């Protein structure tokens, strides 16, 4: 492999798709051979020379390992940079992109471990994707909510409620001041609550809360299903009800289904909330798998208006700088290379709409100052137990979250330092909000 696929003098083309792999070779295997093997197995190579190699322009189509750098503080571990010609990939297909780059190479015998840390998607390839159904600005215009983070709540217990009781919980949360409530990722259409019943009772709750508060409300109706045809049926029913947003579990549902659903949502005026169920199976290991920043980039290309991104401060894992790195990759139009935040390549999104990061998992009102400071306005903060665990009930829990959020936003706008004064801001708000 090394003679053909390791090319340290290669000049990267503007149209190349670039990958950064964290690579741990087996003992005794040279890093150059491993890097070349990764490039070969994820592009044109196989385990031996075949006569049909002579029938193609190998130099035009092969992947190239063009740089290797040792990982500081680790023994026998390298970052391998691989460049892939754009012609290797089908236009507008995240499925084909991932099948090529990570589909086969991770089981390679010469490697102890392999992790895809980052991808550079060139403008020429970015422009073949539709991206999010609507994007951040269109969502704010449709909801008529500006200048603050959006607030949500996952209805608990996640399984076992009847549709009517579920709808009641949705209504209480929305009436109290939240913008959204959410189906949990494993709420689909079980025997205790069929999807059509849930959609109807949740729509009733949304319209009742809207009429009482004068604000646009939404509930992430999970359209994920066992078949794409059934998923379309659920999305179509949501559109008929006139609700603003539906939801999809994009990793368990698959990228092909997700891209199809995103196109349906764009055509039918639905926002699309994306849950990342199963992500930790892929991204939690430090040395093997795919980093979540890659999953976030590919989701933005496939299509999603919201994506769960970790909290930095709650019950789930997430390092602050690294989390902020992929949050920027979800939201911003142009992101510079910054290795301190785990961003290996400069990424130009060419005007593609942004995806709102969703902070969810073990957060409550005392986290509000930190969340406001870390995520800024273009985020959705979701408090499940932090709303429903209020001793007075769901609606007072929602009131407490809304009051805390608006107090933190006002304090920030007045120039106060939320990292130092956050506790004082919440205590001051408590004086005039008994729910908080």
Curated annotation (Swiss-Prot):
Subunit structure: Heterohexadecamer of 8 large chains and 8 small chains.
Keywords linked to the UniProt accession: Calvin cycle, Carbon dioxide fixation, Chloroplast, Lyase, Magnesium, Metal-binding, Monooxygenase, Oxidoreductase, Photorespiration, Photosynthesis, Plastid
Enzyme class: lyase
Top-level taxon of origin: Eukaryota
Function: RuBisCO catalyzes two reactions: the carboxylation of D-ribulose 1,5-bisphosphate, the primary event in carbon dioxide fixation, as well as the oxidative fragmentation of the pentose substrate in the photorespiration process. Both reactions occur simultaneously and in competition at the same active site.
Cofactor field: Mg(2+)
Residues the entry annotates as binding substrate: 104, 154, 158, 276, 308, 360
Location within or outside the cell: Plastid, Chloroplast
Cofactor binding comment, as recorded: Binds 1 Mg(2+) ion per subunit.
Disulfide partners: none
Cross-referenced InterPro entries: RuBisCO (IPR033966), RuBisCo_large_chain_AS (IPR020878), RuBisCO_lsu_C (IPR000685), RuBisCO_lsu_C_sf (IPR036376), RuBisCO_lsu_fd_N (IPR017443), RuBisCO_lsu_N_sf (IPR036422), RuBisCO_lsuI (IPR020888)
Residues at which Mg(2+) binds: 182, 184-185
One Pfam family, short name: RuBisCO_large
An individual GO BP term: reductive pentose-phosphate cycle
Name of this chain's protein: Ribulose bisphosphate carboxylase large chain
Site (Transition state stabilizer): 315
Modified residues (N6-carboxylysine): 182
UniProt-listed Enzyme Commission number(s): 4.1.1.39
UniProt family annotation: Belongs to the RuBisCO large chain family. Type I subfamily.
Active site feature: 156, 275
Record's catalysed reaction(s): 2 (2R)-3-phosphoglycerate + 2 H(+) = D-ribulose 1,5-bisphosphate + CO2 + H2O; D-ribulose 1,5-bisphosphate + O2 = 2-phosphoglycolate + (2R)-3-phosphoglycerate + 2 H(+)
Gene3D superfamilies (alphabetical): Ribulose bisphosphate carboxylase, large subunit, C-terminal domain, RuBisCO large subunit, N-terminal domain
The organism's taxonomic lineage, starting at the top: Eukaryota, Discoba, Euglenozoa, Euglenida, Spirocuta
Protein source organism: Euglena myxocylindracea
Any one GO CC term of the record: chloroplast
Additional free-text comment from the UniProt record: The basic functional RuBisCO is composed of a large chain homodimer in a 'head-to-tail' conformation. In form I RuBisCO this homodimer is arranged in a barrel-like tetramer with the small subunits forming a tetrameric 'cap' on each end of the 'barrel'.
MF terms (GO), sorted A to Z: magnesium ion binding; monooxygenase activity; ribulose-bisphosphate carboxylase activity
């Amino acid at each position: 492999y090394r003679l053909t696929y390791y090319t340290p003098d290669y000049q990267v083309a503007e149209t190349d798709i670039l990958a950064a792999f964290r690579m741990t070779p087996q003992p005794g295997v040279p890093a150059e051979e491993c890097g070349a093997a990764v490039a070969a197995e994820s592009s044109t190579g196989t385990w031996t020379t075949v006569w049909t190699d002579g029938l193609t322009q190998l130099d035009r189509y092969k992947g190239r390992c063009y740089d290797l750098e040792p990982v500081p503080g680790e023994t026998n571990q390298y970052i391998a940079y691989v460049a892939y010609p754009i012609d290797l990939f089908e236009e507008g297909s995240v499925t084909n992109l991932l099948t090529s780059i990570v589909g086969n190479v991770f089981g390679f015998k010469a490697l102890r471990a392999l992790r895809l840390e980052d991808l550079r998607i060139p403008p020429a390839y970015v422009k073949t994707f539709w991206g999010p159904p609507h994007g951040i600005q269109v969502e704010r215009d449709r909801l008529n909510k500006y200048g603050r983070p959006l607030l949500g709540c996952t209805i608990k217990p996640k399984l076992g409620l009847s549709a009517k009781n579920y709808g009641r919980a949705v209504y209480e949360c929305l009436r109290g001041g939240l913008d959204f409530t959410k189906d949990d990722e494993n709420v689909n259409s079980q025997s205790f609550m069929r999807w059509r019943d849930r959609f109807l009772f949740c729509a009733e709750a949304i319209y009742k809360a809207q009429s009482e508060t004068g604000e646009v409300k939404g509930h992430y109706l999970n359209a994920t299903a066992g078949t794409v045809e059934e998923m379309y049926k659920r999305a179509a029913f949501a559109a008929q009800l006139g609700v603003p947003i539906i939801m999809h579990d994009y990793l368990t549902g698959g990228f092909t289904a997700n891209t199809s659903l995103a196109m349906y949502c764009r055509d039918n005026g639905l926002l699309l909330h994306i849950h990342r169920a199963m992500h930790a199976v892929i991204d939690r290991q430090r040395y093997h798998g795919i980093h979540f920043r890659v999953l976030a980039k590919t989701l933005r290309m496939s299509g999603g208006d919201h994506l769960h991104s970790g909290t930095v401060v709650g019950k789930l894992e997430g390092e602050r700088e690294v989390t902020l790195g992929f949050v920027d990759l979800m939201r911003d139009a142009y992101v510079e290379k910054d290795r301190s935040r785990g961003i290996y390549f400069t990424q130009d999104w060419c005007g593609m709409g942004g995806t709102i990061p969703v902070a969810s998992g073990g957060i409550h009102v005392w986290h509000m100052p930190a969340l406001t400071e870390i995520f800024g306005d273009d985020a959705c903060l979701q408090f499940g137990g932090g709303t429903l665990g209020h001793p007075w009930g769901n609606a007072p829990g929602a009131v407490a979250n809304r009051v805390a959020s608006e107090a933190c936003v006002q304090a920030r706008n007045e120039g106060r330092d939320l990292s130092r004064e956050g506790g004082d801001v919440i205590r001051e708000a408590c004086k005039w909000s008994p729910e908080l």
